[in-house]
């Protein structure tokens, strides 16, 4: 979980396993490996996609939360690019997705993964009111005192590669 590597001085080469969008392939391929190797990961849920075709179901998410191996965090309500939304729409994406996840899964969401990796000062300032962490899909680590809000760069991996690798490890 991202919150478990907050103090990087405790680690020489920390790794956080994160998965965006809540595709069912995570449950079918990655989750069994997490159980097999007793490893933790965070998934970033697009709330409006839960129970949709090719996406995780509420029951699957509850099972993973209950396992203690999967931390559920938000990827907003609809995965719309936040920088293109009005202030009201952006706030709704941030606030309502947390409310939904917190109440549905009896958790405390503290991390947002910005859709499409795009954010600006307005989005970060609003996110700081709601979340402890903000993640973006970037090419490296973002660690700036400018926002005084922990933001972590996430490297994009191709989903098919993850699935292929999971088959090789079985």
Which residue ranges define each predicted feature?
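C-terminal active-site subregion of NodB/CE4 polysaccharide deacetylases
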Residues: 1-18, 24-29, 67, 84-170
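Histidine-centered catalytic micro-motifs
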Residues: 19, 71-79
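Acidic (Asp/Glu)-rich catalytic clusters
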Residues: 31-39, 56-74, 128, 143-147
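Juxtamembrane helix-loop-helix connectors linking adjacent transmembrane helices
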Residues: 40-50, 54, 58
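Short histidine/acidic/glycine/proline-rich micro-motifs that form metal-
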Residues: 47-51, 81, 115-118
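Hydrophobic pocket-lining residues within nucleotide cofactor-binding pockets
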Residues: 50, 77, 82-85, 157
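Charged helix-capping and loop-helix junction motifs
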Residues: 54-60, 88-93
């Amino acid at each position: 979980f991202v919150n478990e590597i907050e103090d990087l001085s405790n680690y020489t080469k920390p790794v956080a396993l994160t998965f965006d969008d809540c595709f069912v392939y995570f449950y079918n391929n990655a989750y069994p490996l997490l159980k097999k190797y007793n490893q933790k990961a965070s998934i970033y849920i697009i709330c409006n996609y839960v129970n949709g075709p090719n996406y995780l179901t509420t029951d699957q998410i509850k099972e993973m939360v209950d396992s203690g191996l999967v931390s559920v965090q938000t990827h907003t309500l609809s995965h719309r690019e936040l920088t293109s939304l009005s202030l009201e729409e952006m706030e709704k994406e941030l606030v309502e997705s947390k409310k939904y996840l917190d109440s549905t899964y009896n958790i405390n969401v503290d991390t947002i993964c910005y859709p499409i990796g795009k954010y600006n000062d307005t989005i970060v300032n609003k996110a700081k009111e709601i979340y402890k962490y903000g993640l973006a899909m970037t090419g490296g680590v973002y660690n700036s005192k400018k926002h005084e809000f922990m933001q972590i760069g996430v490297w994009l991996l191709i989903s098919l590669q993850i699935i292929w690798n999971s088959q090789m490890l079985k």
